[in-house]
């Protein structure tokens, strides 16, 4: 591979396992900046499994380690203690077709559980799990896909997401509360993408359709009111 930002390009060689070749063996280790000790988290990563994501939960003594097999239809998530190395399986999903690894970055660890987006019912939907990995409820459901999970307000137990429930060629922004009451937040028909403030009181929305170039606005969540236009590409 040739790359570089300098006057002359450099050459870098790395292993890329092609079909039929063995995957590299991987392992997870924690390092103490105080004692300078290294400890291996001996989670099962055998055969054709690899580690697509490692992240801390809201508990500083709890590391989430995620594994996928090469076929990407068996997903495991372990909770491991970086001090002791003790781990336990917290979530496992087997799909006869495919587990979308892109959704793993959308897992949110809450004070009392975590969220997980899965296609286990045939469509991409948001699920809420307990701290021990027991599914508490399916947050969204229907014959349509959640296309982006935008966050959850733990104070109000409200979930925010983007979906294609109106049409496969449109994207809209919604919120849904603990009782399952759903509210559409985007007001324009077409493609909407939103980024919410930390307290979910406001969101920046990027909207476009076949006849409208991208328009970026700041909106108030409660009233859906457009507060300010950040960018308008209209002629």
Predicted regions and their residues:
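Non-catalytic accessory segments flanking enzyme active sites
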Residues: 1, 25-27, 41, 50-55, ...
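Short, conserved, GDST-rich strand-edge loop motifs in beta-rich repeat architectures
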Residues: 1-22, 68-70, 163-165
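Short, solvent-exposed loop/turn segments at conserved positions within beta-propeller repeat blades
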Residues: 20-24, 70-74, 119-124, 165-170, ...
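Beta-propeller blade signature
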Residues: 26-33, 78-85, 128-131, 174-177, ...
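A short helix->beta-strand "capping" segment at the edge of beta-propeller domains
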Residues: 33-43
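Short coil/turn segments that connect the beta-strands within blades of beta-propeller domains
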Residues: 59-61, 111-112, 155-157, 201
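Large, well-folded core regions of big proteins
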Residues: 89, 99, 106-118, 128
């Amino acid at each position: 591979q040739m790359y570089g930002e300098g006057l002359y390009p450099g050459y870098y060689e790395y292993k890329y396992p092609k079909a039929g070749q063995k995957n590299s063996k991987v392992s997870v280790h924690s390092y103490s900046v105080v004692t300078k000790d290294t400890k291996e988290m001996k989670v099962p990563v055998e055969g054709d499994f690899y580690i697509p994501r490692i992240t801390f939960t809201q508990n500083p003594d709890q590391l989430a380690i995620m594994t996928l097999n090469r076929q990407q239809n068996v997903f495991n998530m372990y909770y491991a203690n970086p001090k002791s190395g003790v781990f336990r399986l917290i979530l496992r999903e087997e799909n006869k077709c495919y587990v979308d690894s892109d959704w793993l970055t959308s897992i949110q660890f809450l004070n009392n559980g975590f969220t997980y987006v899965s296609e286990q019912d045939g469509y991409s939907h948001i699920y809420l799990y307990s701290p021990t990995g027991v599914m508490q409820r399916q947050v969204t459901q229907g014959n349509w896909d959640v296309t982006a999970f935008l966050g959850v307000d733990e104070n109000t137990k409200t979930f925010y997401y983007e979906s294609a429930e109106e049409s496969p060629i449109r994207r809209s922004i919604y919120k849904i509360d603990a009782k399952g009451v759903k509210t559409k937040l985007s007001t324009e028909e077409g493609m909407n993408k939103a980024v919410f403030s930390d307290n979910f009181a406001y969101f920046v929305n990027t909207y476009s359709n076949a006849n409208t170039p991208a328009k970026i606005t700041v909106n108030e969540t409660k009233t859906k009111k457009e507060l300010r236009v950040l960018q308008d590409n209209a002629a």
